[in-house]
Amino acid sequence: MNQDQLKQAVAQAAVDHILPHLDSKSIVGVGTGSTANFFIDALARHKAEFDGAVASSEATAKRLKEHGIPVYELNTVSELEFYVDGADESNERLELIKGGGAALTREKIVAAVARTFICIADASKLVPILGQFPLPVEVIPMARSHVARQLVKLGGDPVYREGVLTDNGNIILDVHNLRIDSPVELEEKINAIVGVVTNGLFAARPADLLLLGTADGVQTLKA
């Protein structure tokens, strides 16, 4: 199977996993990116079986609405049973790097609210140590230089992502050459830098379930 077929397989597996738990009042948290888009397409075939969705980005909200799935603001939702999203990297503890699509802050907020965070990815995303994929950091624009200097002190090589503004109006620094042996500790350190909104490490709140698309089918990993 090619990469898109693997993504489709894990997207369908996620739908199959959550469907038995959904009812007419259920609201599903939905992530951002190419794998999440396959999940939206698969979920849309069952839109009569749940109430609606919370989107982690404007792009996701648009795709959900195009499928006729009602989109709710997170502040109006009292509970969220599931959040389903992709990842740029995952280790075996289901600590993730996310944010390649620049939606990391809203993704992290929705993941924090959800009772169960299901990550869907193809097998290439599972790595022994996080950090080969550059770590995205969302930054208040006026703090860009200050934050970059602090990231260098942590051993990283930050690169400004040209031409990208997040849905929150901020910029992204992609931090290269980090060997992330202690993801929870590094997540906290970077988030403590003044001017950082958040970073793409999902370690303090990792995924609960990883559905991994492989040539031999979908594998399920639990934290």
UniProtKB/Swiss-Prot annotation:
Pfam families: Rib_5-P_isom_A. Pathway: Carbohydrate degradation; pentose phosphate pathway; D-ribose 5-phosphate from D-ribulose 5-phosphate (non-oxidative stage): step 1/1. Homodimer. One of its GO terms (molecular function) is ribose-5-phosphate isomerase activity. NCBIfam families: PRK00702.1, rpiA. This is Ribose-5-phosphate isomerase A. The keyword Isomerase applies. PANTHER family: RIBOSE-5-PHOSPHATE ISOMERASE. It comes from Pseudomonas paraeruginosa (strain DSM 24068 / PA7) (Pseudomonas aeruginosa (strain PA7)). The gene is rpiA. GO terms for biological process: D-ribose metabolic process; pentose-phosphate shunt, non-oxidative branch. The keyword Isomerase applies.
